[in-house]
Curated annotation (Swiss-Prot):
CDD domains according to UniProt: Asp_decarbox
Required cofactor names: pyruvate
Protein known as: Aspartate 1-decarboxylase
Residues that bind substrate: T57, G73, A74, A75
InterPro entries listed in its UniProt record: Asp_de-COase-like_dom_sf, Asp_decarbox
Entry function: Catalyzes the pyruvoyl-dependent decarboxylation of aspartate to produce beta-alanine.
Record-level Gene Ontology MF annotations: aspartate 1-decarboxylase activity
Pfam families: Asp_decarbox
GO cellular component: cytosol
Predominant location: cytoplasm
Enzyme Commission numbers on file: 4.1.1.11
Pathway(s) annotated for this protein in UniProt: Cofactor biosynthesis; (R)-pantothenate biosynthesis; beta-alanine from L-aspartate: step 1/1
Length: 114
């Protein structure tokens, strides 16, 4: 039987920008994506720590090294610049999966990897 397991998590990212009139998505610095094991186009669950909003969107690759986390389209209404968010990707598997987590500071620099 297939179960849903956490695969990747970017913990406590800071929202750096918003583009309301865009197709939609969350734009993540390419380096952060790679370190967390998240792919472009992958579906993610985003939790806003500041206001408890939760939403599902897909990832687009941001500029490597920019440390930017940008919300686009309707998702831009669910967080403000400076809000802290948790970004999670999941996978289907018949056996438990060891997830990869990166923890960020308020400048979106990696302070810990698990």
């Amino acid at each position: 039987m297939l179960n849903i397991y956490l695969k990747s998590k970017i913990h406590m990212a800071t929202v750096t920008g918003k583009k309301l009139f865009y197709e939609g998505s969350i734009e993540i610095d390419e380096e952060l994506m790679e370190r967390a094991g998240i792919s472009e186009g992958e579906m993610v669950l985003v939790v806003n720590v500041n206001n408890a909003e939760r939403f599902v969107t897909y990832v687009i690759k941001g500029k490597r090294g920019s440390r930017e986390i940008n919300l686009n389209g309707a998702a831009a209404r669910l967080a403000e610049e400076g809000d802290r968010v948790i970004i999670m990707a999941f996978t289907l598997s018949e056996t438990p999966v060891k997830s990869k987590t990166i923890i960020l500071n308020d400048k979106n620099e990696i302070v810990q990897e698990k």
